[in-house]
């Protein structure tokens, strides 16, 4: 991180110290640039191309140096369209990697990969900037304590708890509630932990990015009246951007998150949607640079690129970055190099199920498919572990019995199995929860449920103490006391109807 001086020293031009080169070749988003002998830029240095095209329009393209070719030439990848560039144009070596604004001024705003605001809300304070290429924290700075990151969402905290400073893979198709879950996590971390969030849209559809922004404004995650009160910064590199931009936009978002962790000493939530598109962009860049492809056509540097991003996402003694990454699995093949490389870095997986979403169970997190390395008795404690295992066993037994129920009906089951089914259906409904950010749609006030309350609720259902309550009493409530109160209300309503 560096503080930019507000003014230059009198009479000193910043360009006088810069090295000038010239474009010698343009192949799509890749430029070859020749520099004077002994004035070669370093790898990852940012180069600026400024000039006018054939019709006199201003061109301003930023590139990042990727290869040193010899004969005083470098190969750079452009971060924006190269339309209008010509051989012989002047290129300025900025002498440093790409730097982006960081700090409180980024909250509530939308940025591109270069750290430029793209939301038409005016300029951003750029006095504090940070380079996007940095090394991961040293071992001595890391926080080795294994601690749970409480989200206030029952199904996540009980069955697939997140690790503070961990990495979570979010698997979900279109329309199963991925965006709403992301927004609720952003909202809850801000309220419960006083933390902030950074959202990196890597290869996002522009429409989806716009929808997310609008929904965040509606739900109050972004405060339009007082933008500084917002809880999230957004960084987008859309699908129509060159691969260089899509490959680096994750680093821009991560750099903003690192500032909140290291300087403001906060717990930060970092969303990357979609980590597979980061890999895809890297593959395109690799091919453009002339590297030999590796397995399934991916870049040979896949593990290194993934590691350089993932290793920076960690807990230090100052604060933590907990990352939630959407993972696209090509053709549902988990052995594909892109998801396989991602899995090596994940601490937990949250799988969203279309079947649950169709039933109206939101969040539609699958209790059997979602996993976490944190769900161990020595980390979460015996009580939490036992409760989670019993919930999973009951849900699994219900899943096994569903075919029998569909063919023969409930009456053909044994007394024990009927009891299991009744409790499993209550558990399934109790795993749903009203969200703060969905209040507008559901009409129910949102609920944050602490871990102790969550465990107590499921223990009461499993013990049979609540067998007499109707199933619908457990649907879309917070803690178990609300379910009991709802059951009483339902009873009163049914008596009044009679």
UniProtKB/Swiss-Prot annotation:
Keyword list, A-Z: ATP synthesis, ATP-binding, CF(1), Chloroplast, Hydrogen ion transport, Ion transport, Membrane, Nucleotide-binding, Plastid, Thylakoid, Translocase, Transport
Major localization class: plastid
Localisation per UniProt entry: Plastid, Chloroplast thylakoid membrane
Topology term for the membrane: Peripheral membrane protein
InterPro entries: AAA+_ATPase, ATP-synt_VA_C, ATP_synth_F1_bsu, ATPase_a/bsu_AS, ATPase_alpha/beta_chains, ATPase_F1/V1/A1_a/bsu_N, ATPase_F1/V1/A1_a/bsu_N_sf, ATPase_F1/V1/A1_a/bsu_nucl-bd
SMART domains the UniProt entry points to: AAA
Disulfide linkage: none
Reaction(s) catalysed (UniProt annotation): ATP + H2O + 4 H(+)(in) = ADP + phosphate + 5 H(+)(out)
Binding site for ATP: 172-179
EC number annotated for this UniProt entry: 7.1.2.2
Membership in a protein family: Belongs to the ATPase alpha/beta chains family.
Protein name, UniProt field: ATP synthase subunit beta, chloroplastic
Organism of provenance: Schisandra sphenanthera (Southern magnolia vine)
């Amino acid at each position: 991180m560096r503080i930019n001086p507000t003014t230059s020293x009198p009479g000193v031009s910043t360009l006088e110290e810069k090295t000038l080169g010239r474009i010698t070749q343009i192949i799509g988003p890749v430029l070859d640039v020749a520099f004077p002998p002994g004035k070669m830029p370093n790898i990852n240095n940012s180069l600026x191309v400024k000039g006018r095209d054939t019709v006199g329009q201003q061109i301003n393209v930023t590139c990042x140096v990727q290869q040193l070719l010899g004969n005083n030439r470098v190969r750079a990848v452009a971060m924006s369209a190269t339309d209008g560039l010509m051989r012989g144009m002047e290129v300025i070596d900025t002498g440093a990697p790409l730097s982006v604004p960081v700090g409180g001024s980024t909250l509530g705003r939308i940025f591109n990969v270069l750290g430029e605001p793209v939301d038409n809300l005016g300029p951003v304070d750029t006095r504090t900037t940070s380079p996007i290429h940095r090394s991961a924290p040293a071992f001595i700075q890391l926080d080795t304590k294994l601690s749970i990151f409480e989200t206030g969402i029952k199904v996540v905290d009980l069955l697939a708890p997140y690790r503070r400073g961990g990495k979570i893979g979010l698997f979900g198709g279109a329309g199963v509630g991925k965006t709403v879950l992301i927004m609720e996590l952003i909202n809850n971390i801000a309220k419960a932990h006083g933390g902030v969030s950074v959202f990196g849209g890597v290869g996002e559809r522009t429409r989806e990015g716009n929808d997310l922004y609008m929904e965040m404004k509606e739900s109050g995650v972004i405060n339009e009246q007082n933008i500084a009160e917002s809880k999230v910064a957004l960084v987008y590199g859309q699908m129509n951007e060159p691969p260089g931009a899509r490959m680096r936009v994750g680093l821009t978002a991560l750099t903003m998150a690192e500032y909140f962790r290291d300087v403001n000493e906060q717990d930060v939530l970092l969303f990357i949607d979609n980590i597979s598109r980061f890999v895809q962009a890297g593959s395109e860049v690799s091919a453009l640079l002339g590297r030999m492809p590796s397995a399934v056509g991916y870049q040979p540097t896949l593990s290194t690129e993934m590691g350089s991003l993932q290793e920076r996402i960690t807990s230090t003694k100052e604060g933590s970055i907990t990352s939630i990454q959407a993972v696209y699995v090509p053709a549902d093949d988990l052995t594909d190099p892109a998801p396989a490389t991602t899995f090596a870095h994940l601490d937990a997986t949250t799988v969203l199920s279309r079947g649950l979403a169709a039933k109206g169970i939101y969040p539609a997190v699958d209790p059997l498919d979602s996993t976490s390395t944190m769900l161990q008795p020595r980390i979460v404690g015996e009580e939490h572990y036992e409760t989670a295992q019993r919930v999973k066993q009951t849900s699994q037994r219900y899943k096994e019995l569903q075919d029998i129920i569909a063919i023969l009906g409930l009456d053909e089951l044994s007394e024990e199995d009927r009891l299991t089914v009744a409790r499993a259906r209550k558990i399934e409904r109790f795993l749903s929860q009203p969200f703060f950010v969905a209040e507008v749609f559901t009409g129910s006030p949102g609920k944050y449920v602490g871990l102790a309350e969550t465990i107590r609720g499921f223990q009461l259902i499993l013990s049979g103490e609540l067998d007499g309550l109707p199933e619908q009493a457990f649907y879309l409530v917070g803690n178990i006391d609300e379910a009991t109160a709802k059951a009483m209300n339902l009873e009163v309503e049914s008596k009044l109807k009679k």
